[in-house]
UniProtKB/Swiss-Prot annotation:
The gene is lon. This is Lon protease. Homohexamer. Organized in a ring with a central cavity. Pfam families: AAA, Lon_C, Lon_lid, LON_substr_bdg. Residues 786-806 are annotated as: Disordered.
């Protein structure tokens, strides 16, 4: 080998090409991709002259337009061998380094970098020492290439053939995996001896690191041998099973089930059960019937939302806005939901409430539950309980039965995919029971906040937590087993007033009718007067279902008229509504047209809301018999007997001769005859009808009444006051007599109802007679000898405590 020294050369001007993340050494042939405008112009300048360019590395690779101070002083003068312009505007250039050079100063050119530079000479050095160093470098380089797989082995052969020590040092330096700063340091070193020593030092350090890396890889490989061995054995087992005809998918299914078990947040009990079932499944033939049962079980168990919760919205203003937008009125329910959200915003451990919405059909119980789910951010699932008679519908069947499945509760939870949905149990009062069990008793565990955290389905046989579920049940009446009702917070939803129905129509029903019938708002309109006419003359209900049907009918007729070309716009008014809906079905006004003897208007509370109840009484010659008709049940029959006994005991005060009762028969009838009726709340109406019949004094047609009567003439409180008052308002009644103890319930009655009715609380039957009859009966004198001896005074107060009648 030889050590050539380069004589010092004079300075010359060269275009400068700043490089990023690369240092080009002399004797290297390197392809470069050039994209910066200045650099491209520098290359164009070079190609037009002697093709010599100065390649210098910039200090910061991220700098797009570096200042001269941000570029290293020492670089390489190179020849441009080839230049190729690419379609994207960049230039590919092939350069060959010639010699080291140092920049003296930059020339003031703006279009590209240009600098005055001079080549750096190499000093004279001891050739023997350099020869020894070069041999060590080549030997070490061979070891380095063997360990570093990124360098081609051919490079070692090339390096060993190089006779120029300077070229050898630069070639080795260019292939080392060292930092740019260290490569630049090698470039700036002119001494061949020092370059070889640095290269040797860098290689020894890299070889040490690579040897440690190799040892680590060997150790990891040994640790992985066991896993790989098991993998190979499993692959062989799969191949054997495939040859034997077993399904390859069966093994994949096992791996999938195992992965699902590990990823699902099962409870400790459920995880143990799942692992046991999977172990059992591994030992079965995939084609066996029992394997299908186990697979189905694991699918159900892993398909449940274990610990997956929806994020509950706690923004009270947003919740109120959603509830008010979807439903008009229903303030009590909305208030309860907002209270729950308020508490939940403070405490995340609060259990979901269990509400029971009780009210007549069509008042929005089911749709309100959907609205609550939207307001709280919960998933909504609905389970219809109407007609459910089998306890297994709730708790599921045991796995011993063929075709067994979990109950509807677990099925719904899987469908919801979240562990905290809003669960609507619809029509809970319509459940039945037979020899298969009582589903209402199975619901006791589901709806008990203290127990439902450990709900156990017969099919799953592991406990599942339902405590985060918000349960809402709906019912038309409280015909629910007491233990079940005790677990729920009952919220009554009475019917709507006429004003509320009109608002509901304007906000919800009319826009829905227009949307569903593809009408435009400017094509179809219904005036407020027409809406009131529909409410009063074509529907009589607590809810708005029939009201909606009538509005849909109006929309259909409007579409028909528009398509026939009769008109471009249909406006329904109170005057032309008969043309669309026909003859009015109901008469809005008093229940009776005239004041009549023995005919009184009572108020009843049914599962479809409040109703007017006409009670008729007639008297005829006979033997003192009392006849009652109208499909009356036991409680109402007893109520009539109590009313008759009260009137008979007060006969003289009412101007009735006592012997008259033995010579006359009284017949009390409650139309309609086909409708079953029960309850004690018509007692005051019965007594009023009997007094009117016996005295011949007519009853005012615009009075309705409700209340239970005692033998002493006291009027006891009743239930369903709001529904009864709404029925009186719908029927055009002007004056309503209610028990005095129900006066406290008037606070829950809408103001427009109280303002439209004259509501009079009464405590004794004498007050009822005074308000109901057109005139008071006059007491008569009666021969004491003909009266029974020592009867207690009927005016004495009843000593018994207050009893509540519904």
């Amino acid at each position: 080998m030889t050590n050539k020294t380069s004589p010092a050369t004079e300075s010359a001007t060269y275009p400068v090409l700043p490089l990023r993340d690369i240092v080009v050494f002399p004797h290297m042939i390197v392809p470069l991709f050039v994209g910066r405008e200045k650099s491209i112009r520098a290359l164009e300048e070079v190609m037009g002259t002697d093709k010599q360019i100065m390649l210098v590395t910039q200090i910061n690779a991220t700098d797009d337009d570096p200042e001269p101070s941000a570029i290293y002083k020492v670089g390489t003068i190179a020849n441009v061998l080839q230049l190729l312009k690419l379609p994207d505007g960049t230039v590919k250039v092939l350069v060959e380094g010639r010699s080291r050079a140092e920049i003296e100063r930059y020339t003031p050119r703006d279009d590209f970098y240009e600098a005055m530079a001079h080549a750096l000479p190499e000093p004279d050095e001891d050739p023997v020492e350099i020869e020894a160093l070069s041999r060590s470098v080549v030997s070490e380089f061979e070891s380095y290439v063997k360990l570093n797989k990124k360098i081609s082995p051919e490079v070692v052969g090339v390096a060993s053939q190089i006779e120029d020590y300077s070229k050898l040092a630069d070639t080795v330096a260019s292939h080392l995996s060292i930092k740019i700063v260290e490569k630049q340091e090698m470039l700036e070193t002119t001494s061949v001896k020092m370059r070889l020593e640095k290269a040797l030092g860098f290689m020894e350090g890299e070889i040490s690191v690579l040897q440690v890396e190799k040892r680590i890889r060997s150790r990891v490989k040994r640790q992985m041998e066991k896993t790989q061995r098991e993998y190979y054995l499993n692959e062989q087992m799969k191949a054997i099973q495939k040859e034997l005809g077993d399904s390859e998918d069966g093994r994949d299914e096992m791996a999938e089930l195992e992965e699902r078990i590990s990823k699902t947040k099962l409870s400790k009990e459920a995880r143990e059960k799942a692992d046991a079932e999977l172990k059992k499944l591994r030992q079965m033939s995939p084609m066996s019937a029992e394997a299908t049962v186990v697979r189905n079980y694991l699918d159900w168990l892993l398909g449940l939302p274990w610990g997956k919760k929806s994020k509950i919205k706690t923004d009270l203003n947003h919740a109120e806005k959603v509830l008010d937008t979807d439903h008009f009125g229903l303030d009590k329910v909305k208030e309860r939901i907002v209270e729950y959200l308020a508490v939940q915003a403070r405490s995340s451990k609060i259990k979901g409430p269990i509400l029971c919405l009780v009210g007549p059909p069509g008042v929005g119980k089911t749709s309100l539950a959907k609205s609550i789910a939207k307001a709280t951010g919960r998933e909504y699932i609905r389970m219809a309980l109407g007609g459910v008679r089998d306890e297994a519908e709730i708790r599921g069947h045991r796995r011993t039965y063929i075709g067994s499945m979990p109950g509807k509760v677990v099925q719904s939870m899987k469908k919801a995919k979240k562990s905290n949905p809003l669960f609507l149990l619809d029509e809970i009062d319509k459940m039945g029971q037979d020899f298969r069990g009582d589903p209402s008793s199975a619901l006791l565990e589901v709806l008990d906040p203290e127990q439902n955290s450990t709900f156990m389905d017969h099919y799953l046989e592991v406990e599942y937590d339902l405590s985060n579920v918000m349960f809402i049940t709906t019912a038309n009446t409280l015909n629910i087993p007491p233990p079940l009702m005790d677990r729920m917070e009952v919220i009554r939803i009475a019917g709507y007033t006429e004003d509320e129905k009109r608002e509901i129509a304007k906000r919800h029903l009319l826009p829905k009718a227009i949307r569903d019938h593809a009408l435009q708002p400017n094509e179809f309109s219904v005036t407020d007067g027409a809406l009131m006419a529909v409410i009063q003359n074509y529907t009589r209900e607590a809810g708005v279902r029939n009201f909606e049907r009538e509005l849909m009918k109006l929309a259909r007729k409007a579409v028909t008229e528009i398509l026939k070309g009769k008109t471009k716009k249909v406006e329904v008014t109170a005057e032309n509504i008969h043309d669309y809906l026909g003859v009015p079905r109901f008469r809005h006004g008093e229940a009776e047209r005239d004041d009549q003897v023995g005919v009184v208007t009572g108020l009843a509370w049914t599962e479809v809301g409040g109703e007017l109840l006409t009670i008729e009484g007639v008297m005829m010659p006979g033997k003192g018999r009392m006849t009652v008709t109208g499909n009356l049940r036991d409680v109402m029959k007893e109520s009539i007997s109590a009313a008759a006994s009260y009137v008979r005991s007060r006969a003289i005060d009412f101007g009735i001769e006592p012997p008259l009762f033995d010579k006359r028969d009284i017949h009390v009838h409650v139309p309609e005859g086909a409708t079953p009726k029960d309850g004690p709340s018509a007692g005051v109406a019965m007594a009023t009808a009997i007094v009117s019949v016996m005295t011949g004094i007519p009853i005012s047609k615009d009075v309705a009444m409700t209340g239970e009567i005692t033998l002493r003439g006291r009027v006891l409180p009743i239930g369903g006051l709001k529904e009864k008052l709404l029925a009186a308002l719908r029927g055009g009644i002007k004056k309503v007599l209610i028990p005095e103890e129900n006066a406290k319930d008037l606070a829950d009655i809408p103001d427009n109802v109280k303002n439209s009715l004259e509501i009079i609380p009464v405590s004794r039957m004498g007050e009822v007679i005074a308000h109901a009859l057109l005139r008071l009966p006059e007491p008569i004198e009666w021969d004491p000898a003909s009266q029974p001896a020592a009867l207690p005074s009927v005016d004495s107060q009843d000593e018994a405590g207050t009893s509540i009648a519904h």
